[in-house]
Amino acid sequence: MSETKPASSKPAAAAKPKKVIPRVSRTGEPKSKPESRSARAGITFPVSRVDRLLREGRFAPRVESTAPVYLAAVLEYLVFEILELAHNTCSISKKTRITPQHINWAVGNDLELNSLFQHVTIAYGGVLPTPQQSTGEKKKKPSKKAAEGSSQIY
């Protein structure tokens, strides 16, 4: 009494696609995908994180909405400059990996960055070589006239 079902010639019932409801704004225009503030500003650094840190840090009672965007852009520019100089230093020394020492050399050899990071210590950055300055004044050579005039004949 075991009955087997005959093989049907129809393929298995395909799942019906879900009906997509278009996103529409209040005015009836189609909404675009949500975009991050970093993407809207065209920068890589996270604007939302900078905003959160500004608000949690209590640097000011109020933070304008454009302040974290500007600060993130400035931070991204500084990091780009430092990494570019460190890359140049790294390629001069024929290395493929940027180390803290390369960053320290890059910052130390650039006048503007050196003045900005004057009181900053980079961990494992090493020490920059500086020219030795003599503590005393240079000795003057006695002039010929002074040497001739000082000799006494007895």
From Swiss-Prot:
Belongs to the histone H2A family. Core component of nucleosome which plays a central role in DNA double strand break (DSB) repair. Nucleosomes wrap and compact DNA into chromatin, limiting DNA accessibility to the cellular machineries which require DNA as a template. Histones thereby play a central role in transcription regulation, DNA repair, DNA replication and chromosomal stability. DNA accessibility is regulated via a complex set of post-translational modifications of histones, also called histone code, and nucleosome remodeling. The modification Phosphoserine is found at S151. GO terms for molecular function: DNA binding; protein heterodimerization activity; structural constituent of chromatin. It is found in: Nucleus; Chromosome. A motif ([ST]-Q motif) lies at residues 151-152. InterPro entries: Histone-fold, Histone_H2A, Histone_H2A/H2B/H3, Histone_H2A_C. Residues 26-38 have a biased composition (Basic and acidic residues). GO terms for cellular component: nucleosome; nucleus. The [ST]-Q motif constitutes a recognition sequence for kinases from the PI3/PI4-kinase family. Keywords: Chromosome, DNA damage, DNA repair, DNA-binding, Nucleosome core, Nucleus, Phosphoprotein. The nucleosome is a histone octamer containing two molecules each of H2A, H2B, H3 and H4 assembled in one H3-H4 heterotetramer and two H2A-H2B heterodimers. The octamer wraps approximately 147 bp of DNA. CDD domains: HFD_H2A. Gene3D superfamilies: Histone, subunit A (1.10.20.10). The keyword DNA repair applies. Residues 1-15 have a biased composition (Low complexity). Phosphorylated at Ser-151 to form H2AS128ph (gamma-H2AX) in response to DNA double-strand breaks (DSBs) generated by exogenous genotoxic agents and by stalled replication forks. Phosphorylation is dependent on the DNA damage checkpoint kinase atr1 and/or possibly dnapkcs, spreads on either side of a detected DSB site and may mark the surrounding chromatin for recruitment of proteins required for DNA damage signaling and repair. Gamma-H2AX is removed from the DNA prior to the strand invasion-primer extension step of the repair process and subsequently dephosphorylated. This is Histone H2AX. GO terms for biological process: chromatin remodeling; DNA repair; heterochromatin formation. Residues 1-41, 128-154 are annotated as: Disordered. The keyword Magnesium does not apply.
